[in-house]
Amino acid sequence: YIVILYFTQSFSFGAYQIRIATALYALAYLFPFLVLPLGLANFISNMLFGGFGIVDMAGGCIVGILAAACIVLIRRKNWSRVLIAVPIILVPGLGVATYLSYFLSMPYPLMAVNLCIGQMIPSIVGVILVKALEKGIYPGRTAGITGKRSTEH
């Protein structure tokens, strides 16, 4: 997460951002133990590259944990993998906007829309990443958390 953010930091911060690193939240679908590390990675990234201090570090950490936890819930409920995109878009889009709108003197609805639009690319990348890794981990089939065979592709 931190390395990807380092290389994409020119368009990963501010009112208009595409934070490609958030695609990695999708990995929590396959590896639920990543929920806390992804939040911590967001904290460290915002500490190293962000400009809004402790609020951004804590907010990013919370957003990362919530998004990854929602993705784990999607797997536990055995819902479609496509739904992985929803928390990758909405949790950062609506959550980060709560404090960025204040720091950037921008109305919350406008900030939230901007961030949600910017999260669409990482959400698509995240879904594709999970599907590709799943094929490598479970060749010839897709498996849910219970290991039951699924016909969803």
Language-model segments: which ranges?
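Hydrophobic transmembrane alpha-helices
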Residues: 1-36
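Small-polar-interrupted transmembrane alpha-helices in polytopic inner-membrane proteins
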Residues: 1, 40-46
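Membrane-helix interface "capping/anchor" motifs
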Residues: 27-38, 73-83
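Membrane-embedded alpha-helical hairpins and interfacial helices in multi-pass inner-membrane proteins
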Residues: 9-17, 44-153
